[in-house]
Amino acid sequence: MTVPATRKDLMIVNMGPHHPSMHGVLRLIVTLDGEDVIDCEPILGYLHRGMEKIAENRTIIQYLPYVTRWDYLATMFTEAITVNAPEELGNIQIPKRASYIRVIMLELSRIASHLLWLGPFMADIGAQTPFFYISRERELLYDLFEAVTGMRMMHNYFRIGGVAADLPHGWIDKCLDFCDYSLTGVAEYQKLITRNPIFLERVEGVGIIGGEEAINWGLSGPMLRASGIQWDLRKVDHYECYDELDWEVQWQKEGDSLARYLVRIGEMTESIKIIQQALEGIPGGPYENLEVRRFDRARDSEWNYFEYRFISKKPSPTFELSKQELYVRVEAPKGELGIFLIGDNSVFPWRWKIRSPGFINLQILPQLVKRMKLADIMTILGSIDIIMGEVDR
């Protein structure tokens, strides 16, 4: 930490790692001159579990339950990126219905993540009521997830070549009802929060990031779009079936905490529009590419002249990851979630590098909080939207 040696009466304060506003186990060492922040040093690693190393000793299917523990509030995105990488390496085709189901699940997960960002963010800056409001919608969302995947969180639903199960009978109608209800809920949030003078006083002009600065820091997601850069990987990379649906990229040009709030609120509305279109246009057909289930190599499967693979239960696919390098990415709620994968003609990846958006977006925090007030740290940190599971991995 760089503290000017000439300054006297500076106070060094630890915020976290068990402060309720730290959104996990983040620790900030803050140097204060009265109420003014002179310096801030984030200390990471309290939730490090060696996720990248674990991946090197697991097949893709064996590794799927682990990835839901990165960003545990938006687990569909970590699953999507985990299956997209081997799909591209193996040139595996996805059935149209599976692609639509994936988009529906991804956007529902985006809404869930933004809801659980909004409640604690408002609580951080002194507004308790919205936290109870978002719990209402979130419970309905988790009921939808539970009906399809069997789990309210940590869904383990995506598979290489499709999804684990089809949508149950009557689920589409329930989801359409949820979309109609959510639109009124988002309008309620805007009426309750957006024009609130106390809220505006806390967020307007706080934590400003310019467009060029955001690009130089490698920011992504709402952090980047709130600074006037219209960059959304759903439009840029054309993955899944997003091109077949009508929706707009949400962005603001002010670059402050209010702009980041407005981008996320707008994204919730756009996600509802995407889900409604996908539900109405979802095609029939298979939900999984069953060709993936075959073994690539049937040799050496005998033991005492007995084919053990025929009596085993639904085996995990053991196709090899070819010897090449690949970077795949999706637009997660917090930004660009990517994986750099190196295959080595083995069932295990040789290298599995995770590019988590929260880790990169967090790097700009010390610069944003300098010369601000102590109370503004909560506002700025909350507007970045971090989950320590994906920051520390």
UniProtKB/Swiss-Prot annotation:
TM helices/strands, residue ranges: none
UniProt-listed Gene3D superfamilies: Cytochrome-c3 Hydrogenase, chain B
Query: What protein am I looking at?
Result: NAD(P)H-quinone oxidoreductase subunit H, chloroplastic
Give the species. Answer: Illicium oligandrum (Star anise)
The record's note on quaternary structure and interaction partners says:
NDH is composed of at least 16 different subunits, 5 of which are encoded in the nucleus.
User: For this protein, what reaction is catalysed?
Assistant: a plastoquinone + NADH + (n+1) H(+)(in) = a plastoquinol + NAD(+) + n H(+)(out); a plastoquinone + NADPH + (n+1) H(+)(in) = a plastoquinol + NADP(+) + n H(+)(out)
Please provide one cellular component term from the Gene Ontology annotations of this protein.
Answer: chloroplast thylakoid membrane
Q: What is its EC number?
A: 7.1.1.-
Q: What class of enzyme is it?
A: translocase
UniProt family annotation: Belongs to the complex I 49 kDa subunit family.
UniProt xrefs under HAMAP family: NDH1_NuoD
InterPro entries named among the record's database cross-references:
NADH_Q_OxRdtase_suD, NADH_UbQ_OxRdtase_49kDa_CS, NDH1_su_D/H, NiFe-Hase_large
Question: Keyword set for this entry?
Answer: Chloroplast, Membrane, NAD, NADP, Plastid, Plastoquinone, Quinone, Thylakoid, Translocase, Transport
* Cited SUPFAM superfamilies: HydB/Nqo4-like (SSF56762)
Q: How does it sit in the membrane?
A: Peripheral membrane protein
Cellular location of this protein? Answer: Plastid, Chloroplast thylakoid membrane
Domain of life of the native organism: Eukaryota
Species lineage: Eukaryota, Viridiplantae, Streptophyta, Embryophyta, Tracheophyta
* Pfam families listed in its UniProt record: Complex1_49kDa
Q: What does this protein do?
A: NDH shuttles electrons from NAD(P)H:plastoquinone, via FMN and iron-sulfur (Fe-S) centers, to quinones in the photosynthetic chain and possibly in a chloroplast respiratory chain. The immediate electron acceptor for the enzyme in this species is believed to be plastoquinone. Couples the redox reaction to proton translocation, and thus conserves the redox energy in a proton gradient.
Q: Name one GO molecular function term.
A: oxidoreductase activity, acting on NAD(P)H, quinone or similar compound as acceptor
Q: Kindly list the biological process annotations in GO that this record carries.
A: photosynthesis, light reaction
